[in-house]
Amino acid sequence: DVGVVLFNMLTYGNARILGGIADAANSNGYAITMQSFGRNRERTLHAAIERMKQLPVDGVIAVMEEHVTDFSEFRPPKELPVVIISEDPANYCPTIDADQYGCSAAVVDYLLSKGHKTVYHIAGPSSSRAAESRAQGWHDTLDQLGLRIPPTYMGDWEADSGYQAGLALAHDP
């Protein structure tokens, strides 16, 4: 089995990542064993991997969409291969991810090239690594072009927060 560690399996991005891992595992004759570390558990990579070591897995993919206290010093155990999916590269562990910063900057450039005067940003939760990088890409792109940085609307990946931000934006001249 392939072990998968998620801190929140309900977000759209994480559900898509989990689906992709499951499809790839199935195509290669593996199943997945998933461990979701909710708000009530110690939120460290070490704790997550220690839990996975107790399960019948051949390796672990840790989806690090949120900040954990031991990310920079985490070292995977010798007996269990670990790959981290994270915006930031881990110091001692193989890491993969999409370029959240670059994608955000590209979207801003594209919208401005279509004649928009500015681009507003509806951010994900402050605990999200991807949301942090996307916000920075948006901010830096506007700043480099000398454009005013409009206020950020904070969200939480849920539809209602996006709806509320949309209502607020609709009233912004």
Language-model features: locations:
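Short helix-capping segments at alpha-helix termini
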Residues: 27-28, 142-148, 172-173
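Short acidic/polar active-site loop segments enriched in Thr and Asp
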Residues: 58, 116-118, 148
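Alpha-helical recognition/docking segments in bacterial nutrient-uptake
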Residues: 1-109, 113, 171
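Bulky hydrophobic/aromatic packing residues
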Residues: 30, 49-51, 112, 116-119, ...
